[in-house]
Swiss-Prot record:
S-adenosyl-L-methionine binds at residues 40, 65-67, 90-91, 122-123, 137, 204. This is Carboxy-S-adenosyl-L-methionine synthase. HAMAP family: Cx_SAM_synthase. Homodimer. Pfam families: Methyltransf_25. CDD domains: AdoMet_MTases. It comes from Pseudomonas savastanoi pv. phaseolicola (strain 1448A / Race 6). Belongs to the class I-like SAM-binding methyltransferase superfamily. Cx-SAM synthase family. Its EC number is 2.1.3.-. InterPro entries: CmoA, Methyltransf_25, SAM-dependent_MTases_sf. Disulfide bonds: none annotated. GO terms for biological process: tRNA wobble uridine modification. It comes from the Bacteria.
């Protein structure tokens, strides 16, 4: 399937709308996220590797906020535990439609993949089945802050012994100098990937009202409050991190 170049914010906009995962974003999403999130391909592929270590037979592997299904595809490539299935859920109809197309293409290229359900829905309303792996890959930051602990508690309750939550997020930093440095370095990363200053500024204006990052310590304390016993950072590149949370 062809992948288009992200030019959504390339022209000056009189009024920058709030960012939304609509058809325009879906069309360029693979290019957008690769050029915007340092280490994204590494996180996604290794999410599958990590999941294979925690997957338990006859359980569900959840991809919450699955977008185009990159994590779901990685889970299916790496996990071989008997009786497992992947459930991918996203609230964007455009994302869900395209995700199903990508997964159908994956089915045609590989054999013996885990079965998968792709659901259009709200992860806050999801009735969890017993799960051994839950992936929240740059999803929690788009959920209302007051709902985050509730969701994590429900995930913790659904996890079976030996399972894990894998949480990837953009970080903010309480230290002003550290925050400014890593923000500037992230801007440099995006410039190096071909984004103009106009694109960077307009994307920031679009997303600042819908994405609310937390600090690493806020994530750690919230996960512990939700009932997780251990929080282990396994990846960080600039102001992006991924954590393993054990029940």
């Amino acid at each position: 399937m062809s992948k288009e170049t992200d030019r959504i914010f390339a022209q000056p906009l009189a009024q920058v709308p709030d960012f939304a995962f609509n058809e325009d974003v879906v069309r360029v999403f693979p290019d957008m996220i690769k050029r915007s999130v340092p280490g994204y391909p590494t996180i996604v592929e290794n999410l599958g590797v990590l999941a294979a270590q925690f997957a338990q037979p006859d359980t569900v592997l959840y991809d919450l906020g699955s977008s185009l299904g990159a994590v779901t595809q990685a889970l299916r490539r790496h996990v071989r535990s008997e009786g497992c299935e992947v459930i991918a859920i996203d609230n964007s109809s455009a994302m869900v439609e395209r995700c199903r197309e990508y997964l159908n293409a994956q089915n045609s290229m590989f054999q013996e993949l885990l079965p998968v359900q792709v659901i259009e829905g709200d992860i806050l309303a999801l009735e969890f089945k017993p799960a051994s792996v839950v992936a929240l890959n740059f999803t929690l930051q788009f959920i209302a802050p007051e709902q985050r602990l509730i969701l994590l508690g429900r995930i913790r309750d659904a996890l079976v012994p030996g399972g894990a939550l894998i949480l990837s997020e953009k970080l903010r930093f309480d230290d002003e100098q550290e925050h400014a440095l890593l923000t500037d370095l992230h801007i440099a990363f995006k410039r190096a990937n071909g984004y103009s200053d106009l694109e960077i500024a307009q994307k920031r204006s679009a997303i600042e009202n819908v994405m609310k990052p937390d600090s690493l310590e806020e994530h750690r304390q919230r996960l512990l409050a939700a009932g997780f016993s251990k929080v282990v950072p396994w990846f960080q590149c600039l102001n992006f991190t991924s954590l393993i949370a054990l029940p």
